[in-house]
Amino acid sequence: MSSPYETLQIETDGNVQLVRLNRPASGNSINLAMAEELNHWLWELYVDAGATRCIVLTGAGDRIFCGGGDMKERASMEPAAVRRQRALMERLIRQIADCPVPILAAVNGAAVGAGCEIVAAIDFAYASETARFSLPEVRRGISPGAGATQTIPRACGIRRAKEMILTGDMFSAAEARDWGLVNKVVPATTLLEETLAVARTIASNAPLAVRQAKKALDIATDADFGTGFRFELEAHAPTARSRDRQEAITAFAEKREPVFHGA
């Protein structure tokens, strides 16, 4: 299917949506147009995900996943546009966190600044062997503003997060894996297909159950055990009485794969 956006390339693969950040000539950096379009795309998913059960986010080309904010655009921005950009980035990170559909990243190259923060904000990520990561904000005279001080400690631990953010150093895909920022490092030639394969597995599961499990998991790092467990039980209840649950029971008895419909 053709994409309605200028800075995003969107394709469908069954119940999986593949989204490419599509500004390769500018390092897939996030300008105002891309920030607007990412927010619009996520809002549409929040309102009605339709047949989409899992998302894979990657960068166009084979060198850069996302180079962060568009510094060339920023240099000529009026104050009102700067404020608009900040508001859009805040909304973007919140919408990623609140998205009802799991989002996976296929990090196909450098993920710098906001690009690295997007990787930290989504559900989980695979990276190519050539991927690199950096949070260079302190080297550019600012502190992080797209969630890094909150998402990186949750993924990597507070001491590692301080090292990454306060030095602004570049680190490798293997280090990102060892520190918890990405789940797996794979050859560049197989990255997209391996990530899509995981997305297809998620998409084949009961959609309501996946959504409810994701909601419960998303509060696990913030809530105490008792609060989190109560939330899990509340999330579990509608799945236990769903038609998909009955379909799974029937399919098991009939020795076949279940066909889930999301209800």
Segments from the language model and where they lie:
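Short, conserved glycine- and acidic-residue-centered signature motifs
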Residues: 31-34, 85, 112, 145
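Phosphate-coordinating loops and pocket residues in cytosolic domains that bind phosphorylated ligands
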Residues: 29-32, 67, 76, 166, ...
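Hydrophobic alpha-helical membrane-association signature
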Residues: 34-38, 85-88, 118, 191, ...
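C-terminal alpha-helix plus adjacent terminal tail
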Residues: 1-17, 45-50, 62, 168-174, ...
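Glycine- (often His-adjacent) and acidic-residue-rich active-site loop
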Residues: 51, 59-95, 111, 141, ...
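Crotonase-fold acyl-CoA enzyme core
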Residues: 94-210, 237-242, 247-250, 254-256
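Conserved CoA-thioester-binding segment of acyl-CoA-metabolizing enzymes
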Residues: 1-58, 94
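Structured loop/turn residues at beta-strand edges in well-structured enzyme cores
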Residues: 3, 14, 50-52, 69, ...
